[in-house]
Every structure is written in structure tokens, then in C-alpha cells.
Amino acid sequence: MVGGAELSASFPMSSDRSKHTAHLLIFLTVLIDLIGFGILIPILQPFAAKFGASDMQAMWLMGIYSLMQFFFSPVLGRWSDRIGRRPVIIASLVGSMLGYLIIAQAENPVLSMNGKLSLLLLFAARVVTGICGASFSTAQAYLADITAPEKRAGVMGMIGAAFGLGFVLGPVIGGLTSDTRFGPSLPFYIAAAMSLLNALFCWKSLPETLPPEKRGEVRAKVSILGTMRRMGHTHFPAVLLSNFLVIMAFSVMTATFVIWAGKELHYSQRQIGLLFGFIGIIAILIQGGLIRRIAKNGNEAKLALGGAVAMVVSLALLPWGAVLSVLLGVMALMSVGNSLTTPTLNTLASRCGTVQTQGETMGAMSGAGSLGRFFGPFIGGWVMEIAPGRYECAFWLAAVFMAAAVVAILRIRPVVVAGADGK
């Protein structure tokens, strides 16, 4: 790992211009990472099938990314508390570039002669990109470093907007560029190029936010459970549980929705992509702008609660979305709920830690989210397997998970309203 001193910033963070530059670069870091992830959504499974991957292996190929994020988010977050945010972000971008290049090499004529070797390369590359994608928590900690607590909801909303935009642009880029005369590897080269360019931009212009005197020591063992124990006196365990349940419920829905919309509603892949784009656009509008205006110090838990309730209702109503107008209304409500809940939970989490533990705190949040994204598709698939054709069962189970998140969020509310920052 590169030392923080070697990657020190060339200008201080005290100026507004420096902060605006940092906000933009972190936004681009998250956006490019999500575009790189989204590019793979429509093409990874058929790409892996070329090398003999079964449906279950393809599912693991998708899930292992989130699993690596789960294990390494707290680790990278804690390392960023020790050596600084900047070196972790830059090294992760370079690692992501290498991971995408490895995936592209699976199409190499020499390697592709051995399907098992190519498949092994794909798994190795997904492990690398998953580990490097765990730096999302460091990006959140970076923003928390330079943002006053009462303004963090708006900044976390900006990160949510990058998520939404990445999920809109990624699948579109992947679908369009994979079907060209350049071959199916082109999307992976594009993702690698975007990661490299962003790494260069960050190297040149991203300042460090954590001076040496404020850095903590790296603990020998970092884990989500350990972080929860150290912060058990705050509302962090309830925030962490809420985050896990919200993301898992949403992941159950997305995994089931693609199959349900295709088989039951007879939508094409293009139409399904447009529906997810519709969700993403609403997320951009809310998390990129509206959340800044409505989130105030002390009301974040109320917004998270309202968003979670909206998601419970929308998930429960989703099976009645055979009529397009109803479906659009339900999905709009779901996107609004998710866009209110996610950034406010991250804001609440950021207030639980000290300056020295922001990376570890946000790393635990990111890791819990990754675990939710790992389990969600498998739970959705398991429900569809034991109840064939009963897609509503998966949606209703997701609503149950979301209702559990509502209960968890209610445990946060009194602490925040009382005026504590969770400390």
C-alpha cells in the first residue's frame, strides 16, 4: 500500500474551490465505479456461459463481487483511517482497472481454448474488482471529513445520485458496446479506461483530508461485529442493521423483477432496462438535489423511516403492476423511498464515529450493504425455486425484510431527536 505522505495533496482543503474539486472527484470516482459495475450486468452471464459456466456459477460470479466488498470494506475503511483516504482511493481505482483488463483477457484466443482457465480468470478478476470496489466506504469517509454533520445528508445524497446515474448509464453502455465488431471484450476495456482516467485525475487533483495527527492505528483485526461492539453505546448497530435489511430487500426485488417482467409481463430486455433507468432518474433527482433541501440536522431518521415505509408499500403492491401505469407508479414510489432511506442512513452512521474512525464506520456500512446485495439475489432465486411462478412471494418477502428495517429505524429515532449525534 502506498503511503499517505507520498500521495499528499498539493493544496489545502480550507478553500471552497478545493472542496468543490474534491466533491466532483469523489462523485466521479463513485460514478465510474458504478458504471463499471453496471456495464457487466447485461453481459456478464452470457459472457461467462461462453466458457462453460452454469447458471449457478454465473450467479456466483455476480455475487462474489459483493462478497469481497463485504469482507474488505471495513479493512479498507480502517486502512484509510491510518494512512489517509487519498492513497486508498487511488490504489483501488488502479486495482479495478487491472481487474477489468483481466476479464477482457478471458477472450484471448490462447486462454479461451481452455474454458476452465478462462472461467478461473473471470472469478479472479471479480475478486480483485470486488476488493477494490470496497473503497466506496473510503469515499464516504472522505466526504464526511470535509462536511459539517448537519450537511452530510446532502453530500451522501450526491453519492446516491452517482449510484443512480451509474446504474442508468452502465447497463446501456454494456449492452450497446458488447454487440459490435470489436467483440464482447470492448465493455471491459472501456471500464478499465474509465478507472485509469479517474485514478490519474485523483492523483493530480484530489487532496488528502485526514492529516497525520488525526489518523488512528490499524487494528490487527477489523470486522463489522468488532465495529459494532466498539460503537455499541451509539445508535450505530441499529443503523447498520437497517442498512443491511433495506439493501437486501431491494436486491431481492431486483433479482426477481427481471425474471418476472420478462416471463409474466413479456417485456423485452430493452424495456426492462428502461424501467430500471426510470428508477435511476428519480434517484438522481432526489438524491442529487431534493435531499439537500429537506434533510436537516435531527430529521434524518424521520426521512429514513418515511422512505422505508414507502418501500414496504411499493414492494407489497408490485405484484399488481401488470398494468404499465400502475407499475410505473409503484416503481416511482419505491425509488422515492429508497432515495430517502439510503443517504440518510449513511448520514446517521457518519455521526456515530469520531474523526479517527470515520473510515471504519463507513466501511462497516458498506460491508453490510454488500452482504445484503450478496444474499438478496440468492433469496429471490430460492423463493422462485420453491414456489415456481409465484413471483409475488419474493416481492412480499422483500416487503417483510423492509418492514423489519422500519422496526430497526424506529430504534434510532429517539436518539437523534434528542439531539445527540450518536456519540
Model-derived segments and their meaning:
Residues 14-20, 207-241:
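Juxtamembrane intracellular "pre-TM" segments in multi-pass secondary transporters
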Residues 94-115, 310-322:
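C-terminal ends and interior cores of transmembrane alpha-helices
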Residues 31, 99, 113-134, 325-340:
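Hydrophobic core of transmembrane alpha-helices in multi-pass small-molecule transporters
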